[in-house]
Amino acid sequence: MSKREDIHKVLIIGSGPIIIGQACEFDYSGTQACKALKKLGYEIVLVNSNPATIMTDPETADVTYIEPLNVDRIEEIIKKERPDALLPNLGGQSGLNLCSELNEKGILDKYGVQVIGVQVDAIERGEDRIEFKKTMDSLGIEMARSEVAYSVDEALAIADELGYPVVLRPAYTMGGAGGGLVYNKEELSTVCARGLQASLVGQVLVEESILGWE
């Protein structure tokens, strides 16, 4: 692994509490990344809300912050530490979402922080349902019919056009949390409300079900 001479200090976002879909594998990979980057001579600043991790061992990073994983707190750390780069993808969905928010609010540009390990537009294409559809269309890949909704009423109208059952897919959630397969308006109203709340951007894709297709 070659060293980039334009980067001296790297901010790494941890994954926070261990939950289903975002467990100890992120702690392990984050720890290994810290060790590898330190070996190359980079200064490592780590922020994680979970103190009960290997990653937050005092010897893992040069500076460790046990702080809530939110945009305001991350901006404070960036302002104080002035990292050259942000490595978000070792923090699971939490890290990716925070990276997107920091970019959207202009915080990364404000402090001259470049994102490494993953491109911000790649996060958007993978997490934002509209951008994902655009990418698939540009590649000529067929998908099930779908439309994006930002309210329960919009989702109900889309489902009426597509026909039940439909699949609800919230944007920017871990493992599709908050979504599901629904068979009627009552189920859709309940699941969609949950999905909109879970989504970082309040967005749910309403997609025709291909259940039983071969």
Labelled PLM ranges:
Residues M1-E214:
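N-terminal beta-alpha lobe that positions the nucleotide/phosphoryl donor
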